[in-house]
Amino acid sequence: MTTVTLIGTRLADTGREFVYQGESPDCEGCPYRSQCLNLSEGTRYRVTGIRENAQTLDCAVHDAGVRAVEVEPAPVPANVLSKQAYAGGRVSLAGPCPHTECPSHGYCVPDGADFDDERVIDQVLGEPPHDVCALDRDLTLVEFRAEDG
């Protein structure tokens, strides 16, 4: 489902993905609050279109202002335990990982998915980018279904 919202002009690129973090204290009193704060906190979104002929509006959060874009909830790539990795299955993430230097860290601790949430696997992507898991986990890279924002 496409939603029209306002985001920072520096972020307004078709295809860009972001996780909506919610309201900033600087949003208080802004006349555009209802257009900016209309997404679901913690949900990953993809910009699918940029509204043409829309003006750039001043913003206390974004230094270059905000502009109107169309967004849709986006799938979340993530590593899950291999024994649970099948399309259509409901799984949770394997758990926290302190190894931030690992090429898979962004998939083991993905933006837009929480450890205590069960998510539906949309598709199995295959091997994760790391050679060996430092926590000795047998992992598979999957894509979680986009959540309805």
From Swiss-Prot:
Q: Which residues form a coiled coil?
A: none
What InterPro entries does the database record attribute to this sequence? Answer: UPF0179 (IPR005369)
Pfam families, per the entry: UPF0179
Domain of life according to the entry: Archaea
Stated family: Belongs to the UPF0179 family.
Cross-referenced PANTHER family: UPF0179 PROTEIN MJ1627
Protein name (database record): UPF0179 protein Hlac_2319
**Source species, please?**
Halorubrum lacusprofundi (strain ATCC 49239 / DSM 5036 / JCM 8891 / ACAM 34)
